[in-house]
């Protein structure tokens, strides 16, 4: 059979990605597989033959946002496959929530289900056949800017926090093989990534499910454990002049082993002095009802010890105010903890019942206005603490990774600032050509000003 000479148009798939960075990585993996098989990615509904919507189902607002996004995709395109956490959520009747609200979707899967998503895509939009073209770089397709990327090291969680339903949606902890993680990290650095953000549901638990099994990387043994993984990632980052940033670090004892890497030796400046630790509360009774580790005094001692070892350490955390049964005195204990721990970056949610969470059955539910008032008061205190710590940086010269360049100068981040969630540095335009900077470059910036959240500086 003779060829017509015209290449067949590749089928196009649209992608809508909602939720946390872990869901973003799932979306990246789906897009990578689509491109590997020859599909094109469409940035518009009307330019796509089919749309995949990756959902979030953690809190009620996220559920509604996901349902709205599915509805919009159905209205604008008509052919929709749904994946993500909301896909695992049941309705009050016990059936799948998405199928009940949007019965016209083509298929529904749960989270981290690339294979199932691809099967659904194949069923409704057969893949093209072009074995002569490799469309995908080794680093995969990323939705983040080229100079930073998320590295997911595990999926699922073994905790059973009373306010959370993530384990019921994402399952028990499953750690990725250490060699697979290291290979992905190496490919990302080779592709030009300057900042690697390590994520999971519980980074500290990496390897627990496989009893810290020893794997191999570049011919040498490497234990499937957070400490050893961070050390290896730091060594790799040093080869490429890059950063490694740790997120979702539960305060297990072996976290203490990471702090010296941040403070001294060859990994200093590559394993960033930054910990994202979800403390959630500080009063032992509230923590007990949350089914969280309940030794707040010990946590405070450890935070202070970490800072003795690594004075530049930045600690980010999240908290819940107005949890069922929280008394005025218990809330004041939380505020005292924030002041004493001097946390750098803090987020706080007013407690909100989540369908399926065991906390819904607890006594002592607080009125909406009390919960919101406590959240607002918490943030007032947290912002005072944060502003005081940020002000200490004025006059210092800091290493900044440039995220954006425009007519007014540049916008970048220091080691203390993760993308999207922390502050930024507004950098004045370079006065000399020799000092001009580009996106993805590290520059030395003298800090000239600060507000409660961001910094200003000049090269």
Swiss-Prot record:
Enzyme class: transferase
Task of the protein: Catalyzes the methylthiolation of an aspartic acid residue of ribosomal protein uS12.
Entry-linked InterPro entries: Elp3/MiaA/NifB-like_rSAM, Methylthiotransferase, Methylthiotransferase_CS, Methylthiotransferase_N, Methylthiotransferase_N_sf, NA-bd_OB-fold, Ribosomal_uS12_MeSTrfase_RimO, rSAM
Domain Radical SAM core: 143-388
Cofactor note text: Binds 2 [4Fe-4S] clusters. One cluster is coordinated with 3 cysteines and an exchangeable S-adenosyl-L-methionine.
Compartment list: Cytoplasm
Organism: Burkholderia pseudomallei (strain K96243)
Enzyme Commission (EC) number: 2.8.4.4
CDD domains named in the record: Radical_SAM
Residues annotated to bind [4Fe-4S] cluster 2: 157, 161, 164
Source domain of life: Bacteria
Entry binding sites for [4Fe-4S] cluster 1: 20, 56, 85
GO cellular component, one term: cytosol
Any one biological process term the GO annotation gives: tRNA modification
Keywords: 4Fe-4S, Cytoplasm, Iron, Iron-sulfur, Metal-binding, S-adenosyl-L-methionine, Transferase
Name the UniProt record assigns to this protein: Ribosomal protein uS12 methylthiotransferase RimO
Catalytic activity: L-aspartate(89)-[ribosomal protein uS12]-hydrogen + (sulfur carrier)-SH + AH2 + 2 S-adenosyl-L-methionine = 3-methylsulfanyl-L-aspartate(89)-[ribosomal protein uS12]-hydrogen + (sulfur carrier)-H + 5'-deoxyadenosine + L-methionine + A + S-adenosyl-L-homocysteine + 2 H(+)
PROSITE patterns per UniProt: MTTASE_N (PS51449), MTTASE_RADICAL (PS01278), RADICAL_SAM (PS51918), TRAM (PS50926)
Gene Ontology MF terms in the entry: 4 iron, 4 sulfur cluster binding; aspartic acid methylthiotransferase activity; metal ion binding; protein methylthiotransferase activity
Domain TRAM, chain residue ranges per copy: 391-459
Family indicated by similarity: Belongs to the methylthiotransferase family. RimO subfamily.
Domain (MTTase N-terminal) ranges: 11-126
Lineage: Bacteria, Pseudomonadati, Pseudomonadota, Betaproteobacteria, Burkholderiales
Entry cofactors: [4Fe-4S] cluster
